[in-house]
Curated annotation (Swiss-Prot):
Region (Disordered): 54-73
F-box domain location: 70-117
Keywords: Kelch repeat, Repeat
Kelch repeat placement: 114-167, 169-212, 213-260, 261-312, 320-366
SMART domains: Kelch
Domain of life: Eukaryota
Keyword Repeat belongs to the record: yes
Any Pfam family matching the protein: Kelch_1
Presence of keyword Repeat: yes
Origin species: Arabidopsis thaliana
GO cellular component: nucleus; peroxisome
Protein name (Swiss-Prot/TrEMBL): F-box/kelch-repeat protein At1g26930
Length: 421
């Protein structure tokens, strides 16, 4: 029934009329029209930006004429790319099956690099409620995805872990037999591999990502010594760079990026006679001057402070930044607080979702996800067996939480990260 039509044309027509989630914007391409490319200035910027990469990519395929650099039949490469970067990343797996050029564009990560340059990002939530198992959730399509299982290593399986998403990678940090190890999940290959180790391997650190880089600060080494060192991770070449040391040693701290600077907040430091000491200060790292500045009382207050609980029993500060505003979850008081950067004080703005149960803050995820805050957790009661994902778009009003998803699961979140690409 397809005689006389180019092979790729059949595939494209079939793909573009396939049922997909509600955010997909492929349908206009069947007729070749550019219905939503109305911003001429934006398109001109994109064409200038992509011109630098066109020459090297056009000659990479030497197969049939339909595969030799053509992305979408009937459209030039620049217009095809303008359309492709606006599509949901949930569709890229299907799109990659159309022809070799599309597959190369997606599997190489080039399409995600162009999306970053254009500021076209989607924010997916990755979390683990079972040891060595990870799931992803797309807030736009409300779709759940199960990742391949992590490498089976009993020591790593039961060790404390930290996680961080940067670029199209999810990094999971842990302990394996006699040394620290980092496993890397690649969105491009949908597989796990061992990542390059830090210059000073550690655990219990504070971290955050910003575009194509991430900063890790503090933590403790394999002998348990609390560190004041920090490192910068470059996603593009997967390298680690040692940064200047902080003013204070700290572990079990949290990290965020705000106003283009990295902040490490709270944690446990070293007091007199090397005794553990709860830190209420934070530190700001300016990537331009490469200097740390201490900020007093930056760690959010907790409702159960002063009740005799060991500092090590409490989770690191649950913090998130949306639109350069810092928010925190007070798990004991079930409250949400906003940080006033000028007055350097925390103000309560509302409450956490009802089902945001935790064990001294452990098992509850509080993350920035684009222009919203995501809370993942379940009821405190044992045996309930479900978790909820609730979201709130911060504003001047009291938080109004919206249920994004709910599923049967262990109601304890071990690790959580948001991948923006």
């Amino acid at each position: 029934m397809f005689e006389g039509r180019p092979r790729d044309s059949c595939l494209v027509s079939t793909l573009f009329t396939m049922p997909s989630h509600k955010e997909t914007k492929w349908s206009f391409l069947v007729s070749g029209k550019r219905s939503f490319l109305n911003n001429d200035e934006s398109d001109l910027h994109f064409k200038k930006m992509y011109k630098l990469t066109t020459d090297s990519s056009e000659g990479e395929d030497n197969g049939s004429s339909s595969d030799s650099g053509t992305l979408i039949p009937g459209m030039n490469r620049d217009d095809s790319l303008s359309c492709l970067i606006r599509c949901s990343r949930a569709d890229y797996c299907s799109i990659a099956s159309v022809n070799r050029s599309l597959r190369s564009l997606i599997r190489s990560g080039e399409i995600y690099r162009l999306r970053r340059l254009q500021g076209t990002l989607e924010h997916w939530v990755y979390f683990s409620c079972h040891l060595n198992e990870w799931e992803a959730f797309d807030p736009r399509s409300k779709r759940w995805m199960h990742l391949p299982s992590m490498p089976q290593n009993e020591c790593f399986r039961y060790a404390d872990k930290e996680s961080l998403a940067v670029g199209t990678d999810l990094l999971v940090f842990g302990w394996e037999v006699s040394s620290y190890v980092i496993y890397r999940y690649s969105l491009l290959t949908n597989s796990w591999s061992t990542a390059k180790s830090m210059n000073m391997p550690r655990c219990l650190f504070g971290s955050a990502s910003y575009g194509e880089i991430a900063v890790l600060a503090g933590g403790c080494d394999s002998s348990g010594r609390i560190l004041d060192t920090a490192e910068l991770y470059n996603y593009e070449d997967q390298t680690w760079l040692v940064l200047p040391g902080m003013n204070k040693r700290r572990k079990m701290c949290s990290g965020v990026f705000m106003d283009g600077k990295f902040y490490v907040i709270g944690g446990i430091g070293v007091g007199e006679e090397n005794e553990p000491k709860v830190l209420t200060c934070g530190e700001e790292f300016d990537l331009k001057t490469r200097k740390w500045t201490e900020i007093p009382e930056m760690s959010p207050p907790r409702s159960n402070q002063g009740n005799g609980m060991s500092a090590a029993a409490m989770a690191p500060p649950l913090v998130a930044v949306v639109n350069d505003q810092l928010y925190a979850a007070d798990h004991a008081g079930m409250a949400v607080r906003r940080y006033d950067k000028e007055k350097r004080v925390w103000n309560k703005v509302g409450n956490l979702p009802e089902q945001a149960g935790s064990m001294n803050g452990w098992g509850l995820a509080f993350r920035a996800c684009g222009d919203r805050i995501i809370v993942i957790g379940g009821p405190k009661a044992p045996g309930e067996g479900f978790i909820e994902l609730n979201s709130w778009v911060p504003s001047v009003t009291t938080p109004e939480w919206h249920l994004l998803g709910k599923k049967q699961s262990v109601n304890f979140v071990y690790n959580c990260a948001v991948m923006s690409c």
